[in-house]
Design a protein with these regions (language model features):
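Long, charged, low-complexity intrinsically disordered regions
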Residues: 1-79
């Protein structure tokens, strides 16, 4: 299941807080957390997402979308 989180228009700190909360409360079925951060007003949130969550323990990998305003966080499955 893909969960979407729209953070564009927020500050980097606000976006980080919402993403952290979303990661803490993921549903068991969720395999992708899709972050909609936008890009037309700068890419500060996108850059933060790609750097901060690349090494997060719940994230297997970070995938860039064909849409520059979206980054997918692929959730690590614990067996």
């Amino acid at each position: 299941m893909i969960e979407e989180l729209d953070v564009h228009g927020l500050s980097v700190a606000e976006a980080r807080s919402l993403i952290d909360k979303a990661l803490k409360s993921l549903k068991k079925e969720t395999c992708v957390l899709r972050i909609i951060h936008g890009y037309s007003h700068g890419d500060a949130i996108g850059k933060m997402v790609r750097s901060r969550y690349r090494k997060h323990p719940k994230i297997q990998r970070v995938e860039l979308s064909m849409n520059r305003g979206i980054t997918d966080l692929i959730i690590r499955r614990i067996l």
